[in-house]
Amino acid sequence: IFFLNGQYKGILNIRERSNEDNIYTNCDGLEDIDMVENWNELKEGDYDEWQAFVDFYQAHGHSYEEYDKIMDVREFMNVMILNLFFCNLDFPGNNIVWWKPQAEGGRWRVIVKDTDFGLGLYGRSVSYNTIKWLYDPNYDKDNAWANRYEHTRLFRRLMEDERFSREFIDRCAIYMGDFMNFDRTWEIWEPMYNLIRNEYPIHRKLYNE
């Protein structure tokens, strides 16, 4: 609950930044990086490095090992699984930040950002087929800005590799049998819900929501 100069401002959502400050804080003060948001917005560094990566994955036929030399494949896999589980339809064409160290051997990595579009927002069913949505930009005309072909191409190219697709499916099964399921989600969510449940209507009234 947030007050500014004694004036009630409702509930303040504090979250970690998703820009170069995140890297500086979590990577021992690293500053020399390339960073691109939403596939084409240069935030830090050299766009040529990013364009070289895009040119690489636009082509078919690269192996898991080739990809893993220039990007953190398993981290990307985890980020995709996370957003598919959330049914986040404001990703991957939006709310995605790529970065890499400029030092030799630096690989592209992903920062998770803004997943509030998921977990049934706007009444989407738990049976919504996020995989089909990811592969077909015409699957849902009301949610068709973040699944355009240019935004899903990297994932689709990686899924053409047998090793990647097998590991992706295995990880989905393991995660959903362990922590990506209703019971574990509710175990984390319920205390947070109970903490703000009485305050939230007051917050919404303040902002006429």
Language model region names:
Residues 9-42:
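Conserved structural core of kinase catalytic domains
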